[in-house]
């Protein structure tokens, strides 16, 4: 059971985010909507910081971010320690993001995906279990690189 999921978007992902909030509610998932709340132009880093920061600090187990393409949100989210944000464009990528990479943040493009496809992707991502095994060895290497960068070793 997921303890908490944070979701956020900029203006380019607002419509999709609002629909995904309904999907998450229908699944009875504890969810915090981190905004934006209207279609005024806003800066995507502000919302990526809220969601990825919560995941990084352990306040949220998972996060979902939506901007126009998903690219900007992915870049920001992956700056946070312990965040494995995956930009996905189809159901297979959403599945592999969790199954092989244990992605704890799913990033979507509100201007490049239909709400129907995004809904399917979110459901697949949430329903997919992390496989572990050889994939955990790779995630351990990522964690080692992350620690070395943060310490100034790399």
Regions found by a protein language model. Give the residues of each.
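C-terminal binding/interaction regions
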Residues: 6-8, 12-13, 91-154
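Glycine-rich phosphate/diphosphate-binding loop of Rossmann-like nucleotide-binding domains
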Residues: 6-26
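Short, high-confidence coil segments that cap the C-terminus of an alpha-helix
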Residues: 2, 59-61, 102
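Helix-adjacent hinge/juxtasegments
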Residues: 47-87
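A short beta-strand-loop structural module common to alpha/beta enzyme folds
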Residues: 30-41
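Short, structured coil segments at secondary-structure junctions
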Residues: 27, 80-81, 101
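A general structural signal for well-ordered alpha-helical segments in protein cores
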Residues: 17, 44, 48, 73, ...
């Amino acid at each position: 059971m997921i303890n908490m999921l944070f979701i956020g978007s900029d203006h380019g992902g607002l419509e999709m985010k609002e629909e995904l909030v309904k999907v998450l509610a229908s699944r009875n998932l504890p969810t915090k909507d981190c905004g934006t709340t209207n279609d005024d132009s806003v800066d995507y880093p502000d919302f990526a910081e809220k969601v990825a920061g919560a995941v990084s600090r352990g306040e949220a187990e998972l996060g979902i971010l939506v901007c126009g393409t998903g690219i900007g949100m992915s870049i920001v989210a992956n700056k946070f320690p312990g965040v494995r944000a995956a930009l996905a464009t189809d159901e297979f990528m959403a599945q592999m993001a969790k199954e092989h990479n244990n992605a704890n943040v799913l990033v979507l493009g509100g201007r490049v995906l239909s709400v129907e496809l995004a809904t399917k992707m979110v459901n697949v991502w949430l329903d997919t279990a992390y496989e572990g095994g050889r994939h955990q060895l790779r995630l351990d290497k990522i964690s080692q690189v992350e620690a070395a960068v943060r310490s100034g070793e790399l």
